Each structure stands twice: as C-alpha cells, then as structure tokens.
C-alpha cells in the first residue's frame, strides 16, 4: 500500500509526495509537528500539516534569505533570526566568520528538538557558540532592543497560527527600531500566485512599506511551496539591495553555494508584471 503526504494549496490544487515512512508525529503547546521520509525529497518537516522544508530543496530558501542581505551588508556582526527553529538560516549565517552573535527567537522549543534529532543537516549548527536561542514569542522579543541589530531575518511560518503576530504593523515597527542605522530586515513574503496567498502577501507588504523608508521584493523558485513561486522582502533604513553593492567583495569570500550567486542576486529583484501590479496596488501613491 502506498503512503502519500498531501497538502491543499487551494480548494482545487494539491501537492502530493509519496512517503516511505513517518519518522515523527507530536503535538506541542503551539502546533502539530510531523517529519516524513520520502524517496524524492528526502526527509521533510510539516507544521499543522503545512510544508516547512524538505532536505532536497531547503537550500534554495535558506541561501536566498541569508546571502542576499549578507552580500549587501558584509560588515553585519549582530544578527536576529525570528522563527527558523529548523536551523537552516543560522547554518548559512555561520558561514560568515565576521558574524559574532546570532539571537534565534523561536516560539516552539519542540520544533528545535525535533529538527535536531531528525533534520541534522539544518539543525546541527544550533549548538555553535555564536548562537543564542530564546524560546519566546518574536513579537514580544523585538519590543525590547533599540538600535541593536545589523540584520533581522524574519524566517516565519505563514500568517496564521503561532506566527500570526509576526505579520503586524507593531511587529515591523519594532523591527525598524531594533535595527541599527544601516540595518536590513529580510522577511519571507509569501507567494503572489494563488489568490489567497497573494492577498496575504499584499497585506504584509502594505504594513512593511509603512514601517520602512525603503522596501523591495525579490523572488525565488521553491518546488514544494504553493505554486513554486515565492517572494522575500528586503527592507532597510538606507541600504539598497543592488545599486552600489560590492559583489566582488562577496565573491572574494569564497562561500560555496548551490543556488545563490551574485548575478542571480541582481536578477531576483526583477519581478513579473503581475507581481509588480499586486505590490503597487498596496503601496502609497507618490
């Protein structure tokens, strides 16, 4: 008998992956956590039935959420990651010897424990001495620091459930205050393709552009996320993501990547017309 994992992307569209076995299933204080093993995508993690990462394609997400801002701000030393309990974003950050301190704020300790046991390819880095894990609500955590971080990465789940507070005006305003003058915020910006996802993306974008003087969006292809077409947000007080960036300096670091490169970095900010139109619909008119 075949065993399939199926996720509903819209009322009329589903993603299905054949599964060899289920490695873990548990209920934390916040959500249901499952880990499966599949022939095509290797091990994968779901939260409340929604795909978070697979061993086969997680490198795309984690490289693009990390190396884009680090290329723009190579002097970044003090980093805040909100969410990201699987460890993939932290793993990529730790490839930069210049980074001295990473605060990882994850609301659900069980996510970290499960990933450490079943997804060591992303989570084994969490024991690094530069990483400081805080098991608390990111919305609450970010109220405290002022002018503290060079980079904030909002590696959150979708805008419902435990991560819901990470999509509010209050949250983005506090991120702005927590950043240094030349700081950058990166957030996973949802998908522009299916109507329900696009609406969530627009609401988020509207709140960010009201909190930051400069905000751009870049795109990436992630096969196991709804539609495969995914966005990240790049927001800052004054830095630009392409103009004036010293790409040669990043290349000189010799960091070996599987998805990210400096040509792709620049190209990712060129968006399809339908995405530009959805973003412009919620941006302030000048």
Q: Which residues make up each language-model segment?
A:
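Active-site proximal loops enriched in glycine and acidic residues that flank catalytic Cys/His/Asp
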Residues: 189, 219-221
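SAM/dcSAM-binding transferase cores
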Residues: 1-34, 206, 227-286
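Short, structured loop/turn "capping" segments at alpha-beta junctions
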Residues: 125, 185, 215-216
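The AdoMet/dcAdoMet-binding core of the Class I SAM-like
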Residues: 2-4, 53-182, 194-201, 224, ...
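Rossmann-like AdoMet
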Residues: 1-63, 67-69, 95
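Conserved beta-strand signature within the Rossmann-like core of class I S-adenosyl-L-methionine
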Residues: 182-189
């Amino acid at each position: 008998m075949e065993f399939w994992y199926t996720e509903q992307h819209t009322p009329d569209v589903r993603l299905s992956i054949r599964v060899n076995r289920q490695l873990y299933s548990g209920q934390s204080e916040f959500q249901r956590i499952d880990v499966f093993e599949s022939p095509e995508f290797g091990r994968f993690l779901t939260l409340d039935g929604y795909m978070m990462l697979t061993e086969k394609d997680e490198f795309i997400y984690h490289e693009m959420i990390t190396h884009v801002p680090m290329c723009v701000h190579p002097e970044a030393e003090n980093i805040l990651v909100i969410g990201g309990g699987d460890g993939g974003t932290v793993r990529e950050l730790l490839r930069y010897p210049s980074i001295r301190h990473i605060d990882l704020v994850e609301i659900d300790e069980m996510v970290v424990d499960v990933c450490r046991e079943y997804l060591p390819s992303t989570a084994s880095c969490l024991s690094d001495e530069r990483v400081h894990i805080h098991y608390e609500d990111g919305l609450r955590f970010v109220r405290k620091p002022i002018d503290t971080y060079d980079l904030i990465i909002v590696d959150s789940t979708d805008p419902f459930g435990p991560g819901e507070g990470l999509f509010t005006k209050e949250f983005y305003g506090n991120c702005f205050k927590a950043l240094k003058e030349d700081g950058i915020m990166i957030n996973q910006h949802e998908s522009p393709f299916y109507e329900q996802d696009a609406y969530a993306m627009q609401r988020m974008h509207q709140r960010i552009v009201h909190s930051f003087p400069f905000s751009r969006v870049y795109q990436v292809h992630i096969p196991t996320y709804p539609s495969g077409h995914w966005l990240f947000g790049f927001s800052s007080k004054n830095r630009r993501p392409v103009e004036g960036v010293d790409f040669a300096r990043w290349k000189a670091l010799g960091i070996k990547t599987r998805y990210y490169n400096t040509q792709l970095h620049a190209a990712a900010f060129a968006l399809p017309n339908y995405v530009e139109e959805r973003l412009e619909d919620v941006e302030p008119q000048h």
